[in-house]
Structures are given as C-alpha cells and as structure tokens.
Amino acid sequence: MKKLFTKRLLSILLVATFVLTSLLIASCKSTSNVSTTQISKEELLVANSDPALNRQKVQNRTIMQVWCWSFNTIKENLPDIAKAGFKAIQTSPINACREGDEKGMALMSNTRTGGKWYYHYQPIAWKIGNYQLGTREEFKAMCEEAEKYGISVIVDVLTNHTSSYLPDVLPEFIEAVGGKDKLLHANGQNPIRNWSNRYEGTTGKMGGLPDVNTENPLFQDYFMDYMNDTILCGADGFRFDTAKHIGLPDDPRDDYSKDNDFWPIFTGKKAINGKMLSRADELFLYGEVLQGSNAREKDYTEFVSVTASNYGGNLRRAIQQKNLGLGIIEDWNHPANPDKLVTWIESHDTYANQGESAKMTHFQLRAGWAIITARQYGTPLFFSRPQGAEATQFPGVSQIGDKGNDEFMHPEVVAVNKFRDAMVGEGEKFSNGTTRQTLIIERGNKGVVIVNLKDGTEQIKHKVGLADGEYIDHANGIKFKVQDGILTGKIKASKIAVIY
C-alpha cells in the first residue's frame, strides 16, 4: 500500500509540474506555432495519468468517432489521437453482429458482396467481439492503452433492434430473453408509419429492423451483463443508437411490456434482478435522439445527453452557403440545455446514408469543427472519414478495420481542440467580420477563434478582451496584434485562426 501511495503521489506531483509549466508557457507571448510542438510519448503519459479525472471532463472536451476502425488500429493510433488533443474516442458497435455474405469487409461497394459497415449495427448476440472490429481481448487491450493516454472510450450500442434476418440471431440471445416469442415487442414487426405516434415510434419496425422488447426483464438482465462486461474491459461511456425509439417511462406501453424502465435501468437509477449499471456516475452517456415530430428530445435529457441534429444541419447549410449569420450560429435550435447536447458538423449517418454531408470539403468540415469546438457548450463529436478523395462518399480506398483519413491531425483541428481545453468556464461572444463570410468567436478575455470562408483575405480589426501584445495563431502561424484592446491582422482565404 505504501508503494502504491508513493507512486500515486509522484504521479500527481508530475502532473502538477507539467500543468504549471504549460500554464507559464501559455502566458508568455510566444512566436512559435504551438500546434506543431513535438510532444513525446512520455510527456503524454504523464500529462494524462489520471483517466478518472479525464472521464469526468469528457462533456467539456472533444470526442473522435473512430468509425469502423478495428480495436488494433485504434490502439496503434492512440499516440496521434492524444497529440491531436482528443480526450475521448467513440468506437463502432463492438457486439457480435450479422456476418452475411462471405464476412465481407467493404465499407460500401457495388460488388456482389456489397457494403458491410452497417452489419455491426445489427446485433445477433450481446457479447463483445465481432469479425469486423476484433475480439474481446483486443478491445480490452485497446482500452488499457487508451487509459494510459487519458483517453476515454465510448462504445456505440444499439439495443432496440437486431438483424434484419432473424435466423441470424444466435440461440444464446433467444434463450436469454425467454424464447422467440419474447424477443420483440408485440408491435415489433410492424413498420413505423406515423412518426409522431410515440407508440409506433418506440415499438415498431424501423428501416427493416425488427424492434426488440427492451422492457423485457430477461432482455434487460442479459443486456446488463454485456454493458457491465464492456465497462469491466475499460469502457467509459456509451452512445445509444436510435435512442428516441426506446420509450420513456411515461410513453405508451407495448402489450408485452410491464414498465417502460429501460432508461432508469441503463443509466444507473434502477436495478434489474439486483444488477446495477457499474460506475454509472462516472460514465458519459448520450443518446441519438434525432429531432423531428414528437421526438421528446428534452425529456430524454433527464437520463442522457442528446444529439443536436438540427444544429448540425443548420451549420452545414451555413457553411456551404458561406453565410455565418449570428442568428444561425448562436441558436442551438434545441429545447434542452446546451450543456446536455452532443454536437457535430458530420456524423456517420449524414456521411454514409443519404450523404447530405458527404460532398463537403475538408476545409468546410474543419470550419464547422472550429465553430462547434470553440463554443462554450455542447460536446463536439469529430467524425473520422474513410481515406481517399475529399468531398466523396466512400472513395473506395479504406475497408472496415482501417484507419480513417488524417484530418484529425490537421493543425486547425488540433489547435481548436487545445483551445477548447484552455477555455473551459469562459463565456462566448460572436461577431462577424466585414461580411457574414467571416466569424469571430471570443471566449471571455482569454481567446479568439476566427473562421474565414471568403475567397480572399479578411482584414481583422476587432475590439477584444485580450491583453495587449503580439500573438501567433496556433493553427497557421498568422501574426496578430492587440493594441488598446483592438485585435488586428490578416487572415487568408479559407483559413482558421486560433488566438490565445
């Protein structure tokens, strides 16, 4: 015990030294570009040696969605993810999944076997590991490595449906829930027709996928074992896919359900057969509650954070139209408190399904990322696109398991990630430049982010709270000056400046 205490004390002292040194460096007027600073593996391990503290702060930091990356690929790239300033990763679903034709690994293609990315969204048993991402042992090893870097692991789970081909569901799943007759809601094979009808929306078949009876106590017991095993392996949170299709306690009940108690149980407020969700108070939990008719998005925040899907759509349009009007940018377009929102400029659904974001360029995505990450509230989620040509849906370079493209390491992405860390607790203020094509985001009196969508250079002359002096922006090395409270400088076309 004495050795453990001494080791822990030394770790705390090292972290304190690192943090104090970083603060002293940041307070100086440096002429170097911080985003290009080389950080050793040893420094990263010391700086992030308290993952419990890190998990509590996921809500205020940034998440990287490592979409379709295998566990081993994630593990190999954790040093780069940490250097890029991400404090959490979100994996694709890690459960046993549909295998289909020849266990294909194509993300999407027109070949005979077609695309398979959506197969891990069709669970056939609630146990860790699938042919696409890796084994339970590999998942556990990845989580252990992530903990060394202070990176939280969030796992995507999809409880309310199963394979579109029911014979794929493994016998252990069927037996655990009490047989085939108890697997689905009474309404579970009927397609949703009226999306504003909460009974249909929370019990009906969606997208060809039968609706699992998530209120069946036997299912809940079985699924709790999976959740707690995932936590035991090192998961620090969960994203609940299609969360708005799982009923809230006061929603209409299915004929096969006694209570709509899924959310109280799987957020740690209620036990199932004596089993509680492990470490519930430490987990970051959020639900995919896409906004629409009678989505009840605010009501879900009693249990989990929720997605700000309308804001993401509005922001994409604003960037594509080069109109960063303050009314568009400031309005979350959501009834919930903004500290309960998960934000994105692109998600795997907006990229991979109808492709409404797939034609956006790398810079357009970085501009959107800069805006949501520079803001005071919301938890920004960065979608890692597959490798290949930009502004292209499924370029055909990557397959399932591969690393995505390198945009997560772009200096503009890294700079705003670190800006967010430095600005926790500071208020936000928005202004436009000479036109609505330029946006200036101020965080208290500590920092400024400028996004320039113009085809030409923008001359900045703006009153700020920053101390007088010369500043080098952390993204592109642009020189700025503050004199008598006026920030001046020039930002070239299609650039982002991060100043603090």
List the model feature ranges, each with a label.
Residues K2-L14:
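Bacterial N-terminal signal peptides that target proteins for export
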Residues L24-S27:
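C-terminal motif of bacterial Sec signal peptides marking the signal peptidase cleavage site
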Residues K29-T31:
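Bacterial signal peptide processing site
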Residues V34-W67, T73-K83, E175-N194:
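N-terminal carbohydrate-binding accessory modules
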Residues Q38-N60, E76-A82, P93, R98-Y121, ...:
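Active-site-proximal helices and loops of the catalytic beta/alpha 8
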Residues K57-R61, C97-E144, A176-N213:
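Aromatic- and acidic-residue-enriched carbohydrate-binding clefts of CAZyme catalytic domains
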Residues C68-K75, L133, E137, N213-P217, ...:
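Soluble non-cytosolic domains of exported or imported proteins
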Residues F71-I74, D80-A84, A88-I89, E138-I151, ...:
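An active-site-proximal structural segment forming one wall of the substrate-binding cleft
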